[in-house]
Amino acid sequence: MSPATLQDDPSVDSFFNVVETETLALFEHLSFEFLEEFDVFAPAETGRTRDHEPPELMRGFLHCYYKDIYGIRPVERELRNTVVWLSCGFDRPPSRDAVDRFLTDLEHVVNKVFDHLVEQAALRGLLDLTYCIDSTDVRAMPADQDASKCYDPTDDEYYHGYGCTIVSTGQKIPIAAEFTESKQAPEETAMRVTRDALAVAKPIWMVGDSAYDTLDWHDHLLAAGVVPVAPYNARNTDDPKDIEYRVEDRIEQHSEDVQLKQSTLDETYNRRTGVERTNESVKDCGLGRTHARGRVHARAQVFLALCLRLVVAITNYERGDNPGSPIITV
């Protein structure tokens, strides 16, 4: 049963008029029925009906993350609230086993759920022509034995957890991401996430910090018709070039007719703060610290946080509010 169906029922019409909430607003413009198409949520081959309600449970988790409620038990407790489980479309509160199993199974397809929401954001024109890429830390619970000791070069400290590489655009809109073992991800990760971002739509600029000063990354983007802007890291060579950005050198290898002004590159690179704001916004949605014991649930939580950020942006856009706002006003 969908929230819309519930609101059409005269017996609860007055109820929802009284409790108009951010939860109802979150699900007003997006349908999650597409989750039922994934095989992972299908009944077991033995014929036993699995206690799965994918659209309702997805709405339930998004509600909880929006309210800063994480972890299987806290989520299950929150979904016992009559206002909440009715708002999410349940006929009755889900069991703890159902909540746990949904998160476990969701991990298999959560990146596809994220991709679906990215498409919805793109259809609404929420992307712009500058993409920014960056990695961020994902702190884990001490009891998470799958997490490892990671180094955060930004804060010059070690932490227990994982990492996430994100490409964002527009008003704090994540469009591609990969869950990683640590914040310092290998070059292959940057290449995969970059390809995923370009598959959504082609920008004019792709901005990264000096960690993305690699030939393969620059050449791949230039070949795709995108201008990469990352500071030249002179420490990568014994014979440093007299340039500020790697693209100043690589552009000559790809085109003799293209020239880039230093001021234009500087102005474009300054937009990199956009991905930092996106990272902070997604951390507010639950990415910053996982409340999971194990990599599977940790990865699911990270992508749920990314999904929530997209849902909030789309909801605000549809309601005529600022898509970049982290909250929904009702």
UniProtKB/Swiss-Prot annotation:
Function: Involved in the transposition of the insertion sequence ISH11.
Keyword DNA-binding listed: yes
InterPro entries: Transposase_11
Signal peptide (UniProt feature, chain positions): none
Species of provenance: Halobacterium salinarum (strain ATCC 700922 / JCM 11081 / NRC-1) (Halobacterium halobium)
Recorded family membership: Belongs to the transposase 11 family.
Alphabetized UniProt keyword annotations: DNA recombination, DNA-binding, Plasmid, Transposable element, Transposition
The name this protein goes by in its record: Probable transposase for insertion sequence element ISH11
Any one GO BP annotation for this protein: DNA transposition
Gene Ontology MF, one: transposase activity
Matches recorded under Pfam families: DDE_Tnp_1 (PF01609)
